[in-house]
Amino acid sequence: MDVVFTYGRFNPPHLGHKMMIEEVINKASKMNKIPVVIVSHSYGNKSNPLSVEDKTRILKRWFPQLTVLSSSKNLSLAKIAENFDEKSVMVVGENRKNAFSFLPFNRHALKRPNAAPSATKARAAAMNGNKEVFKNLTGYNLTNNIQNKISKASTITKKKRST
């Protein structure tokens, strides 16, 4: 499969992720490749409060036609990438450009604007119930469901640390 792809935790997906996925789609269109997003299976702690299903649902709302794959304990990013053509391209944030050197693909690094949204900021806004900040960072409403999942994961992480 000849693709332009990106990989991330997307926990939660935010406007910076959306911008990166738009770059994946645009680059894929120009290069006549398939745009793909691979969602990490990381889940169940303060940094990873949303499940693959939660993250995929949000990404598919933004980009209904997008191919979204996910890693798992038995299916690593490297294993998924074995199905990609050697001329495939990976799009990553500039801060992650060296993190994927184990993959044999050309990488296209995107500069991160100063004041760019971050999942850490979005999770903090959710924890504080700050719906306006959350929406400014993510582009979607902070639902009770998302807020509860983020709060619950943070509480579980705190309990693990204190024992």
Residue ranges and their predicted role:
Residues M1-T163:
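Nucleotidyltransferase catalytic core that binds NTPs
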